[in-house]
Amino acid sequence: MNPENLNIKIARNVEIMDYKDLAELIFPDVKDISYYEEKYPERNLPEGAVVTRFAPSPTGFVHIGGLYQALVARTVAKKTGGVFFLRVEDTDQKREVENGVTGIVNSLKDFDMAPDEGMISDTDEIGNYGPYKQSLRKEIYQAYAKYLIAQGKAYPCFCTQEELDEIRQKQESAKIRPGYYGVWAKCRNLTVEESAEKIKNGEPYIIRFKSPGREDRKIKHKDVIKGNVDFPENDLDIVIIKADGLPTYHFAHAVDDHLMHTTHVIRSDEWLSSVPLHLQLFHELGFKAPKYAHISPIMKNDNGGKRKLSKRKDPEAAVEYYKKEGIPSEAVKEYLLNIANSTFENWRKANPDKSIDEFDFQLNKMSVSGALFDMIKLLDIGKTVISKMTAEEVYNYSLIWAKEYDEELAKMLEDKEYALKVFGIERGNKKPRKDISKWSDVMYNIGYMYDDEFYGKVNEYPYQVISDKEDIAKILDLYISKYYNESDDKQTWFDKIKELAVEMGYAGEVKEFKANPGMYKAHVGDVSTVLRVALTARTNTPDMYEIMQVLGKNRIAKRLEVAKENLK
């Protein structure tokens, strides 16, 4: 870093005596760490309460794997009466995208996973352990970096990029492990006076951690999910404060999770190899380390092989995809819990009406290997979730989605009274309709109930078994002129269709037709299909009686007439 970045006041003639003086030279105006230790006291929580966080970087869209981690973290915290907070890790500001923080906050809101603490908008936050944006915690990190320098556990590094490239080239030529460590750490053994002289001369520098580790030694670590794992010790002198004065991820993680009193760090297993470094940082800073739980990634079947869901290849990798498709947030969360704990599926079967919040989630029972993403199963869960909603709920969710993604559907739903009748078909029964898996299905599944949509798109009537046009026309004529009465109850309605079938030479019972197929043209089910197709242009719909009750006499009469005209 340039001294100007830190507002360093250099007294060129001051004699540097020890590490504390060097620390003061580099960070003269930062507070002592005791100030922050007092400012962020232990949380007043019940015994056993877990404090977790979701700590994404605003460098792109929110990945479904990120939402998965957030759901697990939130579930564990809620179960124990703990705290789930949102921290934005925005120290890599070159990669930050516009509205990145807003996208993160909105994704959690969309899935009803708003944090107890942390960022609640691009600029606003709640909680007593902030700031919750790392870019606003610069002085905090510098205070702890100063502490390490004063202890001889960190040092300024003046190596240029050219020098670092040269080190790497020599390591590659010698076929040895690359990195800034041991004899390759050129600035590690500079004396305090040498470092001070370079600083006074205005040489740019960064701050590195002085690792006490040796690669030939092993550490044993118990991960909450992965179990016992052995690693070589970290011996890399990693950068902890960059040239711009901001911390690296590793250093910020240790400082933040200490001051915010995170008890469990739940994150992707791509960070598993960083555990030795992170534990080392916690130890050298004098912090109690949190427990780590490394989640396996969500996988995809790719031509018989497994690979991670890719931001580049797979649209379903983005959380925004589920919103655009209109997959209910509750369905997505339920599906993710399904792959998180193998016991969830049986629990759901035994408790079909309970909230997912009542499931006894076990972090240590998560799979150590990545689960395959199954869109079919997710949509099936979506059908179940929507089937349990009231007509009013389905209407409201459909309208909210349509206003953003389907202008035609939004216009169609303007008549709320009629829409509620449509959505009420086969809803509230013991076996409610399950034809809608996501809000983008709504137009297809109810469009035929609206005349403009029906007449605008009907181009054929798939009558199936009965193909004789004269018979079809006569069925339609007789039904509207002789048998239809909108005040009939369901049994009377169906009995009349049976009478119509018999009058036309069809079996009034399916079993009669099967017993003597030669005696009948077909059976009552086929006659019902003619009416269904004439009224909806579909062979498969929810309950036909309920559909006709909603359509009403005038619509029915007109549709049967149009269907008859279509036969000519």
Which positions does each model-derived feature cover?
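Glycine- and acidic
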Residues: 52-59, 85-90, 259-265, 316-318, ...
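Helix-rich, typically C-terminal accessory recognition domains appended to large enzymatic cores
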Residues: 495-504, 508-551, 555
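A generic secondary-structure signal for well-formed alpha-helical elements
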Residues: 108-115, 149-156, 168-171, 175-178, ...
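Residue-level signal for inorganic ion chemistry
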Residues: 73, 104, 148, 152, ...
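Active-site cores that bind ATP or allylic diphosphates and position pyrophosphate for catalysis
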Residues: 155-294, 299-309, 318, 476-487, ...
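Catalytic adenosine-cofactor/nucleotide-binding cores of aminoacyl-tRNA synthetases and other
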Residues: 285-466, 536-568
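N-terminal Rossmann-like or analogous alpha/beta NTP/dinucleotide-binding catalytic cores
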Residues: 2-173, 273-287, 331
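Short amphipathic alpha-helical segments and their helix-coil junctions
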Residues: 49-53, 85, 315, 355-363, ...
